[in-house]
């Protein structure tokens, strides 16, 4: 008992005589434990946040892209598969848009309609969803080219040229990064952002006439959201 009492007396005496060193050691241990706890929980927190974000925006489980397109019969077959709850035929293609410094690439997406229940629902930053075939919503990143609501944007590719009126500025769940927008098959290969339109406004640029002739069907889609 005496030895134990003497031991603790010695410990506290040493601490009181070297407060600075004791405090430094304490802080090193505390910070190390805090950093370790943070790093250990970060993956789960990030995964949970991303999962919640994607669920809130009805992120599609699968995206099918066909070089020869999807007919209405193809869509019906996919829709009949076991476990498939929803199939959305649409267009996805690359295009170039003009600005004061030249032309840059964008990816164009489309759907039959835009509402709160759609798959891959864009998040409106400003404006509204398109309601007419000559209306579009644009990537918030395209604001650096001074595009604003009410302006028109001209898109072109090997299938032709079409002009759309900008009615909304959005973020899209398909792009988690605020910087990287992928690559483009046109121009210099870089992608500056995305533009989204209605299917009726996308068919002209999205469907290659040679593919339509090959399949003897001018009502084809280039991608399916499932």
Model-derived features with residue positions:
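Membrane transport/envelope proteins' first extracytoplasmic loop
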Residues: 2-226
């Amino acid at each position: 008992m005496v030895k134990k009492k003497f031991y603790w007396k010695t410990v506290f005496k040493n601490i009181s005589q070297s407060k600075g060193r004791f405090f430094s050691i304490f802080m090193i241990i505390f910070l190390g434990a805090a950093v370790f706890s943070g790093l250990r929980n970060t993956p789960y927190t990030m995964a949970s946040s991303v999962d919640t974000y994607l669920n809130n925006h009805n992120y599609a489980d699968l995206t099918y892209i066909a070089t020869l397109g999807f007919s209405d019969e193809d869509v019906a077959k996919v829709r009949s598969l076991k476990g498939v709850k929803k199939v959305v035929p649409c267009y996805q293609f690359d295009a170039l848009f003009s600005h004061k410094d030249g032309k840059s690439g964008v990816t164009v997406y489309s759907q039959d309609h835009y509402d709160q229940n759609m798959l891959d629902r864009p998040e409106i930053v400003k404006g509204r969803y398109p309601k007419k075939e000559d209306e579009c919503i644009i990537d918030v990143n395209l604001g650096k080219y001074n595009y604003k609501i009410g302006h028109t944007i001209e898109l072109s590719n090997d299938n032709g040229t079409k002009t759309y009126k900008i009615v909304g500025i959005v973020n899209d769940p398909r792009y988690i990064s605020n910087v990287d927008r992928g690559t483009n098959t046109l121009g210099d290969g870089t992608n500056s952002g995305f533009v989204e339109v209605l299917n009726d406004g996308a068919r002209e640029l999205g469907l290659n006439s040679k593919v339509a002739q090959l399949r003897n069907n001018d009502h084809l889609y280039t991608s399916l959201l499932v």
